[in-house]
């Protein structure tokens, strides 16, 4: 019995030693990767890197925030400077700058001026559309079961019934299921889809969407929320904008500066669609009365191509770090086309959230029905190296 006990203690010491060695190796591997990534990114492509690009170990008061799909780099230095300068003009309305932004976006999307409306982020666009079409005598909102929640939120606010279509395997959007829900309804249908989808980060191929939109089903409006399109490299993705440019009047595109351009707190977005749709939306908003710093930052951000290149490269490297971690841990995750990733847990998301928060890392909220999955936003490469180390330690400790 004594020999067995000694053997057991020896095993425990060996396992503990192996675990500590694994954690040390992992920390060095991911830490060196984060440092190498930082050095490799095209920082010199612009005059000055964002002030918050350096990494500081998280604390309870200053956690790693990878829960809201924010761009951890912050706005480009030139956009920050423009916003600071605009504060001094805060006693004035930004009428000229708003007109400039409106015109610039119309030129970018090759549409007349009455095809576009500036909004306070894309959320105001969703609200305006639901508010406008809720006045119809019989209307429904059709959405994938697992998607961004603002569509459902505003539908409930305006008493619009919501039809949720179950997802396919690996949380793919069931376009045929959405179509069936529309075909079986004798009123007006609003089809809201996010592409790439949130929280899954996956692309719904253009081939599955365009034919349906082009068929112009009666009493149907398509809302395409492309908040993350700037990150996409998947050849199966194509913006719905080309259908609007071709003259289709049953679809509206929603865009935001919150994600790729790192302007979540500035609240600048826009909608592109046929004049009749844009006019209905205008009646639901307080005009294009955006804040001065936000408008000027948006104008500068659109022209700052070096920073856009840097932002894409940083996001790609952060994605590689997290994917590598998941691969090493054997965790199932979906392919990412955005600035976040969706992976499967071996426990409910609420429990995992608490464990990560105890390590001063904030991760995504629950997304029913995927209650054993977690959405992690992609921070800086240095942040993701830290997160990868923590996940590896948690797995070694048996708590993840």
Residue ranges and their predicted role:
Residues 7-35:
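N-terminal secretory signal peptides and thylakoid transit peptides that target proteins
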Residues 90, 100-140, 158:
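Phosphate-binding glycine-rich loop
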Residues 135-193:
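PLP-dependent aminotransferase-like
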Residues 167-169, 316, 326-359, 378:
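Conserved PLP-binding catalytic core of the aspartate aminotransferase-like
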Residues 175-186, 199-222, 226-258:
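Active-site pre-lysine segment of PLP-dependent enzymes
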Residues 250-334:
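PLP-dependent aminotransferase class I/II
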Residues 355-359, 367-400:
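PLP-dependent enzyme catalytic core of the Aspartate aminotransferase-like
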């Amino acid at each position: 019995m004594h020999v067995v006990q000694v053997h057991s203690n020896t095993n425990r010491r060996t396992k503990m030693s192996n675990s500590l060695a694994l954690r040390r190796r992992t920390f060095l591997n991911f830490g060196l990767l984060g440092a190498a990534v930082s050095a490799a990114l095209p920082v010199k492509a612009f005059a000055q890197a964002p002030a918050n690009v350096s990494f500081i170990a998280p604390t309870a008061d200053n956690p790693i925030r990878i829960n809201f799909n924010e761009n951890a780099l912050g706005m480009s230095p030139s956009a920050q400077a423009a916003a600071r300068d605009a504060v001094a003009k805060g006693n004035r309305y930004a009428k000229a700058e708003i007109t400039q932004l409106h015109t610039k976006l119309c030129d970018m999307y090759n549409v007349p001026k009455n095809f576009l409306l500036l909004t306070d982020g894309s959320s105001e666009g969703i609200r305006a559309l639901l508010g406008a079409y809720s006045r119809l005598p019989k209307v429904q909102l059709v959405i994938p079961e697992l998607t961004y929640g603002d569509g459902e939120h505003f539908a409930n606010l305006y008493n619009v019934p919501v039809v949720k279509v179950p997802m396919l395997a690996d949380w793919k959007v069931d376009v045929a299921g959405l179509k069936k829900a529309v075909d079986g309804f004798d009123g007006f249908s609003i089809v809201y889809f996010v592409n790439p989808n949130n929280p899954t980060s996956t692309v719904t191929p253009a081939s599955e969407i365009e034919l349906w939109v082009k068929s112009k089903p009666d009493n149907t409006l398509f809302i395409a929320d492309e908040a993350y399109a700037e990150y996409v490299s998947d050849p199966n993705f194509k913006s719905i904008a080309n259908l609007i440019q071709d003259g289709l009047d049953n679809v509206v595109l929603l865009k935001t500066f919150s994600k790729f351009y790192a302007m979540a707190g500035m609240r600048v977005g826009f909608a592109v669609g046929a004049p009749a749709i844009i006019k209905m939306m205008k009646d639901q908003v307080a005009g294009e009365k955006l804040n001065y710093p936000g408008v000027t930052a948006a104008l500068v951000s659109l022209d700052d191509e070096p920073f856009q290149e840097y932002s894409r490269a940083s996001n790609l490297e952060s994605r590689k770090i997290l994917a590598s971690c998941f691969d090493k841990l054997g965790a199932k995750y979906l392919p990412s086309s955005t600035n976040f990733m969706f992976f499967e847990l071996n426990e409910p998301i609420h429990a995992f959230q608490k464990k990560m928060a105890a390590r001063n890392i904030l991760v995504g909220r629950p997304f029913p029905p995927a209650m054993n999955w977690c959405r992690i936003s992609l921070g800086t490469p240095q942040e993701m190296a830290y997160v990868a180390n923590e996940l590896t330690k948690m797995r070694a400790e048996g708590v993840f």
